[in-house]
């Protein structure tokens, strides 16, 4: 029986708008897709295609300037309709108008003896995430271990069976492939009710609140990252794609997406293709009266993309919540309303049943202020790290302190709950991302 790990620190946000107990709606039709280079942290994109060029699903559209063998590929076949650039000509998006009939790149099975080359050529390498730094790993790197979290514990997240999309055999084949990339162990984090075991991995059962499903929490609980260590994390959906590649010779870029949130008329599960436009996913299913904020991802770590945006990595959830439910609320936080949610028992709602769900909006109820050293991060931060002191060291750009306090173990998503409960209203995930980028620049 796999070892049980109990995560005691954390917080489950019980939000209205969960999509549960449904088979995915058949593929959502759309011709508007985009690839967002910011989804592949650590890469400096160099375009391989220009506007008007035709691409096939699985064909490379850009590569990394520093490691040209790392390719990012198109999820659909079609015409490159637009290349969106921002400040200093930074590539913000590469838009593709999909063909009516899709064609996939086929890969030569004889090349699969070189696993690394196959993953690089197929574009799946870009979906690995390395710790330290939370970036796409270098092809020269060899991980100490590889971690797979098979469940998502974030608010309104889709279930385990939807993440793997009922492709357990492809998942197990993907794990077998991953086991050949490391001299260490492939660790799989599971919930007790959805245990997965293979001959090429070691499974752990995790219980407890969010962030139990985060790879960082599982790494810290199973085998923490020390200075000099390199470990990789990968999403379960990508493991299925790897298994599909090594079984059938092509990559299936479809995904299952949970459409969730209070501002959605009917929370549902749909089948789509990675990078699809948000307007197609949400067609006639948003309550405009609630002035919705459309988030690609979950409400803690997702990106505010708006109605004209696109589905972003990890391509599994869209959350739509009201911008502000009540802009002129009498007494505000001092109202002590039992209907209001509080992580610190400010309101009497903490006496309500654990099954009760709450209304959440995008209002932050205050502005940025000095850090209050009250140990509030520690209540929801399950790692053996002094989170508040680490944040202060990052802000000060004190590399020695950052290393001593465990920056090599963390990535921005590990601080999402801390950001949610933060009295100081700091953008902690942005601070951590900038700190990791600074550290990487100084140490390499």
Specify the residue positions occupied by each region the protein language model found.
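Buried, small/hydrophobic-residue-enriched core segments of structured protein domains
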Residues: 70, 84-444
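Generic structural motif
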Residues: 39-45, 55-58, 67-82
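Acidic/polar N-terminal loop/beta-strand segments that form early-domain functional surfaces
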Residues: 36-40, 50-52, 64-66, 83, ...
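Mobile cofactor-carrier "swinging-arm" domains
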Residues: 1-13, 24, 81, 86-103
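N-terminal, Lys/Arg-enriched amphipathic/low-complexity engagement segments
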Residues: 1-48, 63, 203-206
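Residues that act as N-cap/strand-start positions at coil-to-secondary-structure junctions
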Residues: 29, 41, 66, 264-266, ...
